[in-house]
């Protein structure tokens, strides 16, 4: 039986491939659909309607309109770090009360 971390890794891999399909990469449209389905709260809180376009530009390092798994994982890592930073600040504030 996989551990929670192994399950989390498996979920990230399966999610990427679910949206990438057989081609093995995400297009901007694939990324938009993935973000809408898997990160609806993140997109709802964005004040910029071009958020997905900007994310795609940041992730598409080769400028070929494709986002591979490594770039996708860097997005997940960045979002996780931001969430952790918020969590740490929130917990410190909660502890001061």
Swiss-Prot record:
Q: Where is this region: Ancestral calcium site?
A: 60-71
Q: Know the name of this protein? A: Protein S100-A10
Q: Where is this cross-link: Glycyl lysine isopeptide (Lys-Gly) (interchain with G-Cter in SUMO2)?
A: 37
- Taken from the record, one Pfam family name reads S_100
What GO annotations for molecular function exist for this entry?
A: calcium ion binding; calcium-dependent protein binding; protein homodimerization activity; transmembrane transporter binding
Subunit composition and interactions: Heterotetramer containing 2 light chains of S100A10/p11 and 2 heavy chains of ANXA2/p36. Interacts with SCN10A. Interacts with TASOR.
Where are the N6-acetyllysine modifications?
Answer: 23, 28, 37, 54, 57
Is Nucleotidyltransferase included in the keywords of this UniProt record? no
Concerning SUPFAM superfamilies, the annotation shows: EF-hand
What's the miscellaneous note? Does not appear to bind calcium. Contains 2 ancestral calcium site related to EF-hand domains that have lost their ability to bind calcium.
Task: Please give the organism.
Answer: Homo sapiens
InterPro entries per UniProt: EF-hand-dom_pair (IPR011992), S100-A10 (IPR028476), S100/CaBP7/8-like_CS (IPR001751), S100_Ca-bd_sub (IPR013787)
Q: Does the keyword Nucleus apply?
A: no
Q: Name one GO cellular component term.
A: nuclear matrix
């Amino acid at each position: 039986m996989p551990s929670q971390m192994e399950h989390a890794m498996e979920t990230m891999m399966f999610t990427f491939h679910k949206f990438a399909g057989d081609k093995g990469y995400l297009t901007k449209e694939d990324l938009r659909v993935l973000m809408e389905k898997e990160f609806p709260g993140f997109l709802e809180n964005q004040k910029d309607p071009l958020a997905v376009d900007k994310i795609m530009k940041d992730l598409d390092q080769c400028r070929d309109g494709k986002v591979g798994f490594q770039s996708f994982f860097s997005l997940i890592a960045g979002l996780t770090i931001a969430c952790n930073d918020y969590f740490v600040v929130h917990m410190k504030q909660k502890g001061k009360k």
